[in-house]
């Protein structure tokens, strides 16, 4: 029998301080990823996704730091030209390392220092928060007609729906992609973190539909 995630069995993610909400989101995510009762496989898939998500977040932050470093090293005379050339070089030549003079902190690894400041589970929590709906639409029949009535969602149901949307979006993305499911899932989570992606679109569409049907609230019986 597989135990739920605790701070003890996630100790190897040393930079991530797990809050109660993050633990709850992680356990719920694993349960919704599970197929045919294979929880160990779902746990492995979840942590593969976290590793890919952390690399993606680290890569994006490294690009931002590199661009800030470029701006800091500009000369007053040709600052605009340097900025354009170096930023194009940074975006187009991803395999080529751009060396930027930074403050020497002995021989410490800049990436490891940056890694310590990034919590991948915090990214996951923010991503889920960005796609979590606050309302749902319930069908009610009145005089032979069916009306869609906005209703407030409980926090548990809203979080579950957000996770389902992210997983479903990743599955659809995998059908038209050469990436594996963990890569697609990490990409969808990161898109949600940026308030983008299919899951965010579903949330916005649901909220728009709720606003459009707000006049039907008078038919609510609960």
Curated annotation (Swiss-Prot):
Cellular localization per UniProt: Mitochondrion
GO biological process entries: translation
Alphabetized Gene3D superfamilies for the sequence: Ribosomal protein S7 domain (1.10.455.10)
Pfam family, one: Ribosomal_S7
Function: One of the primary rRNA binding proteins, it binds directly to 18S rRNA where it nucleates assembly of the head domain of the small subunit.
PANTHER family: RIBOSOMAL PROTEIN S7
Protein name listed in UniProt: Small ribosomal subunit protein uS7m
Organism: Prototheca wickerhamii
Lineage summary: Eukaryota, Viridiplantae, Chlorophyta, core chlorophytes, Trebouxiophyceae
